[in-house]
């Protein structure tokens, strides 16, 4: 009887563990965001979907959570009109600290190198010349054309204008590098061009 109870307990633990889906979390502090609602949104090719939300605590802390995606993909956190794009890959635990006013440009991000890289690109786009932004984004594209950072970089805009122009032969090579890399690494991914 003792062995049967132990076996049943073991089976229950295994079944519970198998039913739990892997998740990722985004947490942090928005110092002046108390009592505001923060949203976690998935940004797909067909639109944006709210995945999770919470009210920021009095001390500015928040926690958002969702099931891990099958492929790395784009998400964002949003408070009102302020948003921060993120790349989520698997079961990451991302930490973000910012003020509400600087949320869209914060670089105080840990737990995801991809998120930090696109935050750096956004900061460069905000303050640097077009040539400096082109050089910085080109380096990120060439370094890993199969990454979502490269995908983000080829579609990057500065002041509402595309940084890269697919109709220009020199720019087209970067688009081709990303498209070919995605096709090789993720042929069934919906972002494969």
Q: Could you say what each language-model-derived stretch is?
A:
Residues 1-29:
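Bacterial Sec-dependent N-terminal signal peptides
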